[in-house]
C-alpha cells in the first residue's frame, strides 16, 4: 500500500537536513527538564524531547514521572518557544498528550512490535493533525515497521516519519542495538518520501559513539537525528551512558559534514555503468551456478543422497572466505554471500528431490 504523506516540518523550523530532536531520555524533575531545554534552546535547537512514560525491560527501574511531566513540557514550550515531543504507548498517553498540547509524538520500539497496541494508538489519533514518528520494532522486521506506519496512516494521519534506533541483539560488542543499515535503506527504497530520523543514542549505547553515528546517518542521506541530551548526563536516572550535554551536542552538530543528496556527474555516471555491468555478470554467473546446483540435485535424487553435505559446505565457506580476503574483501561478508547462495541451492535441490 502507498502511504499518503505530508511534510512533518513545524512552523519556524527550517526544512533542512538534519532535523534535530534533542532532550533527556527521561523527564526526571522540573528543574532538570527546564535546565536542559534552556541550554538546548540557547544552541538554536527547536525540537525538545523527553520521555514521560518509560517502558523498561524489567520492573523496578525508573519508569517515568507520568502525567506530571507533561506540565513541565508545557512550561518548556512557554519559556523557550521550543516544540515539545514525547513517546506514547497507549491510548491514554495519546489523550493526555493532546490535552497538554504536545507538538510531536513518537511510538516506541516495544510498542511498534505489537500491532494491537499500535492500532489502539492509531484509533486514539483519528481526526488529529499531529506529526507522529514510528520507531523500528526491537526485532529486525521491516514489514512490522511498515505495518505500524500503515495503521497510523489509515487513521488519517499524514505527517509521518520513521525513527531508526537499531535492533536488539545478544551481540553487544560495539553497539547497544545493531544498526543493520540495510533495513532503513530498504524502507527508504520502499517509501521514498517518508522522512527517516536516526537515533544514535540508542544504536550506540555509549556517548562516544554518538558523533560517528551522526555522521554516518548524514552520509547515508537520512533526514534527521533524535539525540538524548541531559544537563548532567552522569546523574541521569535512565540510560546515563548514552546521553551527552547540550554543549557536547552542539559541538557534534557543528562538526557534521552534510553532503549533497543528488548530484550526478559524468564520471559518476560512467562508474555506475561499470557497476551495472558487474551486476549483470554476477547474475549470469549465479544463474549458471544454480543450473549446476540443479544438476547436482538430480544426481543426489538418483543416488538416494541427502541434500546437505556438511563437509562440502564447510569447504566452500572456508575456501571462499580465504579467496575473498586475498581480494581485499571482508571474510564475514563473503560468508554471508555464500550462505545465501547455498540456501537458494538447497531450496532448488529440494524442489527436484520432492518432485
Question: Where are the language model's segments positioned?
Answer:
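Domain-level signature for soluble enzymes in the chorismate/prephenate branch of the shikimate pathway
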Residues: 261-355
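N-terminal amphipathic alpha-helix/helix-capping segment at the start of soluble metabolic enzymes
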Residues: 1-21, 75
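Catalytic beta/alpha-barrel core
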Residues: 65, 81-94, 103-118, 130-142, ...
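Active-site mouth loops of central-metabolism enzymes
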Residues: 18-35, 59-61, 82-88, 108-109, ...
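Glycine-rich, proline-tolerant flexible connector loops at the mouths of alpha/beta enzymes
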Residues: 49-68, 231-240, 296-307
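Catalytic alpha/beta core domains of metabolic enzymes, predominantly
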Residues: 13, 117-251, 255, 260-266
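A structural motif
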Residues: 42-45, 102, 157, 222
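Hydrophobic faces of well-ordered beta-strands that scaffold small-molecule active sites
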Residues: 18-24, 46-50, 84-86, 105-107, ...
Amino acid at each position: 500500500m502507498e502511504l499518503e504523506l505530508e511534510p512533518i516540518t513545524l512552523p519556524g523550523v527550517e526544512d533542512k537536513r538534519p532535523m534535530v530532536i534533542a532532550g533527556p531520555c527521561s523527564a526526571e524533575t522540573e528543574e532538570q527538564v527546564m535546565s536542559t531545554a534552556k541550554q538546548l534552546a540557547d544552541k538554536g535547537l527547536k525540537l525538545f524531547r523527553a520521555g514521560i512514560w518509560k517502558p523498561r525491560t524489567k520492573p523496578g527501574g525508573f519508569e517515568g514521572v507520568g502525567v506530571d511531566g507533561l506540565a513541565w513540557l508545557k512550561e518548556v514550550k512557554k519559556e523557550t518557544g521550543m516544540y515539545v515531543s514525547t513517546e506514547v504507548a497507549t491510548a491514554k498517553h495519546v489523550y493526555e498528550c493532546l490535552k497538554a498540547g504536545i507538538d510531536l509524538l513518537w511510538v516506541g520500539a516495544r510498542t511498534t512490535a505489537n500491532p494491537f497496541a499500535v492500532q489502539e494508538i492509531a484509533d486514539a489519533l483519528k481526526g488529529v493533525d499531529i506529526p507522529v514518528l514510528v520507531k523500528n520494532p526491537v526485532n529486525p522486521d521491516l514489514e512490522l515497521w511498515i505495518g505500524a506506519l500503515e495503521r497510523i496512516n489509515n487513521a488519517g494521519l499524514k505527517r509521518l516519519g520513521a525513527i531508526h534506533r537499531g535492533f536488539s541483539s545478544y551481540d553487544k560488542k560495539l553497539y547497544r542495538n545493531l544498526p543493520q543499515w540495510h533495513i532503513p535503506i530498504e524502507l527508504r527504497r520502499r517509501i521514498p518520501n517518508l522522512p527517516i530520523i536516526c537515533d544514535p543514542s540508542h544504536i550506540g549505547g555509549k556517548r562516544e559513539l554518538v558523533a560517528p553515528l551522526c555522521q554516518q546517518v548524514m552520509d547515508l542521506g537520512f533526514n534527521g537525528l533524535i539525540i538524548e541530551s541531559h544537563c548532567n548526563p552522569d546523574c541521569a536516572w535512565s540510560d546515563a551512558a548514552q546521553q551527552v550535554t547540550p554543549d557536547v551536542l552542539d559541538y557534534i552538530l557543528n562538526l557534521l559534514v552534510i553532503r549533497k543528496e543528488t548530484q550526478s556527474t559524468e564520471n559518476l555516471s560512467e562508474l555506475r555503468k561499470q557497476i551495472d555491468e558487474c551486476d549483470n555478470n554476477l547474475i549470469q554467473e549465479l544463474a549458471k551456478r544454480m543450473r549446476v546446483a540443479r544438476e547436482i540435485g538430480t544426481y543426489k535424487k538418483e543416488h538416494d543422497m541427502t541434500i546437505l553435505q556438511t563437509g562440502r559446505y564447510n569447504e566452500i565457506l572456508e575456501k571462499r572466505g580465504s579467496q575473498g580476503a586475498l581480494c581485499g574483501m571482508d571474510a564475514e561478508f563473503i560468508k554471508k554471500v555464500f550462505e545465501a547462495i547455498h540456501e537458494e541451492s538447497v531450496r532448488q535441490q529440494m524442489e527436484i528431490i520432492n518432485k
